[in-house]
Structures are given as structure tokens and as C-alpha cells.
Curated annotation (Swiss-Prot):
Primary localization class, coarse: cytoplasm
Lineage of the species this protein comes from: Eukaryota, Fungi, Dikarya, Ascomycota, Taphrinomycotina
GO terms (BP aspect): exonucleolytic trimming to generate mature 3'-end of 5.8S rRNA from tricistronic rRNA transcript (SSU-rRNA, 5.8S rRNA, LSU-rRNA); nonfunctional rRNA decay; nuclear mRNA surveillance; nuclear polyadenylation-dependent mRNA catabolic process; nuclear polyadenylation-dependent rRNA catabolic process; nuclear-transcribed mRNA catabolic process, 3'-5' exonucleolytic nonsense-mediated decay; nuclear-transcribed mRNA catabolic process, non-stop decay; rRNA catabolic process
Matching SUPFAM superfamilies: Ribonuclease PH domain 2-like (SSF55666), Ribosomal protein S5 domain 2-like (SSF54211)
InterPro entries referenced in this protein's UniProt entry, alphabetically: ExoRNase_PH_dom1, ExoRNase_PH_dom2, ExoRNase_PH_dom2_sf, Exosome_comp_Rrp42_subfam, PNPase/RNase_PH_dom_sf, Ribosomal_Su5_D2-typ_SF, Rrp45
Subunit structure, interactors included: Component of the RNA exosome complex. Specifically part of the catalytically inactive RNA exosome core complex (Exo-9) which may associate with the catalytic subunits rrp6 and dis3 in cytoplasmic- and nuclear-specific RNA exosome complex forms. Exo-9 is formed by a hexameric base ring of RNase PH domain-containing subunits and a cap ring consisting of csl4, rrp4 and rrp40.
GO molecular function: 3'-5'-RNA exonuclease activity; mRNA 3'-UTR AU-rich region binding
Pfam families cross-referenced by the UniProt entry: RNase_PH, RNase_PH_C
Cystine connections: none
Segments crossing the lipid bilayer: none
The protein's name: Exosome complex component rrp45
Annotated family: Belongs to the RNase PH family.
Organism: Schizosaccharomyces pombe (strain 972 / ATCC 24843)
Localization, UniProt: Cytoplasm; Nucleus, Nucleolus
GO cellular component: cytoplasmic exosome (RNase complex); cytosol; exosome (RNase complex); nuclear exosome (RNase complex); nucleolus; nucleus
């Protein structure tokens, strides 16, 4: 079984002393997020997110199924994550780790419980048929802050995804291929963004977007999920350290600035990809007309 290698005492002392002086190994300030890159695939709902050496891919798929009996007017949203040795040698293949469970629950709460995805719009026939939206998250490389990376990937993929158009006559549902009718975007009401803080010196020092080495040395962490409208969706704290309420408020203010910036990057990437796809679609249509 592959085990995680602990940081040496010299490296630990160097990193902690640097953080106390407001310095980080990659040159960032304590409240700086790494440069975010978002690339969409050829199909709707495929996205590749990376910052630093952390890289995550997400894919959205849908199928028509029966809604839950206690929610006959709602569709279904689910998320699956996959942590394998491909991303980090300490992860075990075929085994669901506690970290994987935490990530799945945090993202599921961020999307579904905050009503970011309008599940009522996924209803086709009440109590009989609805859309089941699945988000599959694959971690390609782990250099810290997997929660934030997974959240950004899922939100970007949901905003990018298009489902087939439907025609409903009575209880008969017809699914139109994308070649026949323009696919329909999901109803996304807002973009919840996870921002994770790592704490040192028993909670007195907080940093944003920790690298893997910084995560190994921290006393605990806290993830704040919020959107650009200053609405806090959830707060999750890992670790037994006590965090002063004033520190939480300070972190929330920092998280808001980061969330606004991340939403802007996501929207810009979406707009650019949409323009590319429209150009390809129009070019393909013109080619078909000439032939």
C-alpha cells in the first residue's frame, strides 16, 4: 500500500517560518488564489480546470428516469468523484477514501441545497419522468485544494452543458437529437464557489488555496461556499482547532472577492467557448447548404 511521505522537519520549519512572515514558496501572498485556467471539451458539459499543479476534469451527463416519490416535481442531481493513484500516489485504487466522501458531499450541498441548479426545471412529467443530471469528477493531479478545484469544475460544466430538446404530448416524451434541434442549457440560478482556508499557529494564521505541502502542515481548514451576491451557502470546518468568529468574518470577506474573480473567469471561458461553437455550427450549416 502506498503511503504519504511526511514533510521533513527542516522543510516544515522553513515553510512555517515563511508563512509567519507573509511569504509562500510559490511567491503568492497569503490571500492569493493560484492562476485559474478553464478549458472546455468538444462536447457540452466537459471541462478541464487547473491552478498550479492541481488539475481536475468534470463531465455532465443526463438520462430520463423516475423522480423520487417524495419529490415528484423535482429532477435529480448526483455527483461521483474518483481519487486514484494517477492524481497522487498515496491514494488507493478501488477504495473510497474519507476525503473523497467529503468532497462529494460538499459539492452536492453547494449545488443542490443552495438551489444553484433549478431541479424543478428538470421535471418532465410529474411523478413519472424527470432528468437525472450526473456530474463525474476525475482528479488528474493533486497539489492541494481539491475541494475548490472540484467545485469550480462542476459549476463550469453545469453552465456549459446542454441537454436535448423534448416534446411532450400527454404522457409521450420525444427526445430530439442535437442534429435536429438546438440543445437546451440547464437552469443555473447562481454560481456557488468553494473557497478553502488553511490555518496555522492554532488558527491565528490563515492562507487561501493551500498547496499539498501547506495542507500537510496546517492545523485545520475551513471551506466557505458563497456566490458573487454575497450569499453564504455553507461553511465546513475540518480539524479540531478553535477559530475566532472575527477570523471567520475576515475569511468570508476574502472569500467573496475570490468568488467574484472565479465567477468572472468561468463566465469569460463560457462566452469564448460559446462563440467558437457558434462559429463551427454556422460554418457547418453553410457547408451543408453548399453541398
Amino acid at each position: 500500500m502506498s503511503r504519504h511521505l511526511e514533510t521533513s522537519l527542516n522543510n516544515k520549519e522553513f515553510v512555517l517560518n515563511s508563512l509567519e512572515k507573509g511569504l509562500r514558496l510559490d511567491g503568492r501572498q497569503l490571500s492569493d488564489f493560484r492562476s485559474l485556467e478553464i478549458q472546455f471539451g468538444k462536447e457540452y458539459g466537459q471541462v478541464d480546470v487547473s491552478f498550479g499543479h492541481t488539475r481536475v476534469m468534470a463531465r455532465i451527463t443526463t438520462e430520463i428516469t423516475k423522480p423520487y416519490t417524495d419529490r415528484p416535481f423535482d429532477g435529480i442531481f448526483s455527483i461521483t468523484t474518483e481519487l486514484t493513484p494517477l492524481a497522487y500516489s498515496a491514494f488507493e485504487a478501488g477504495r473510497v477514501s474519507d476525503q473523497e466522501i467529503v468532497i462529494s458531499r460538499l459539492i452536492e450541498k453547494a449545488v443542490r441545497r443552495s438551489n444553484a441548479l433549478d431541479t424543478e426545471s428538470l421535471c418532465i412529467i410529474s411523478g413519472q419522468k424527470c432528468w437525472h443530471v450526473r456530474a463525474s469528477v476525475h482528479f488528474i493531479n493533486h497539489d492541494g485544494n481539491l475541494v475548490d478545484a472540484a467545485c469550480i469544475a462542476v459549476i463550469a460544466a453545469l453552465c456549459h452543458f446542454r441537454r436535448p430538446e423534448l416534446t411532450v404530448v400527454g404522457e409521450e416524451v420525444t427526445v430530439h437529437p442535437v442534429e435536429e434541434r438546438v440543445p437546451v442549457p440547464l437552469s443555473i440560478l447562481h454560481m456557488p464557489i468553494c473557497v478553502t482556508f488553511s490555518f496555522f499557529n492554532n488558527g491565528e494564521l490563515a492562507i487561501v488555496d493551500a498547496t499539498l505541502e501547506e495542507e500537510d502542515l496546517c492545523n485545520g481548514s475551513m471551506t466557505i461556499t458563497l456566490n458573487k451576491n454575497r450569499e453564504v451557502c455553507q461553511i465546513y470546518k475540518a480539524g479540531g482547532i478553535i477559530i475566532d468568529p472575527s477570523k471567520i468574518i475576515s475569511c468570508a470577506k476574502t472569500a467573496f472577492d475570490i468568488a467574484v474573480s472565479v465567477c468572472s473567469v468561468i463566465q469569460q471561458a463560457l462566452d469564448e467557448d460559446l462563440r467558437k461553437k457558434e462559429t463551427q455550427y454556422l460554418g457547418g450549416s453553410a457547408e451543408n447548404e453548399r453541398s
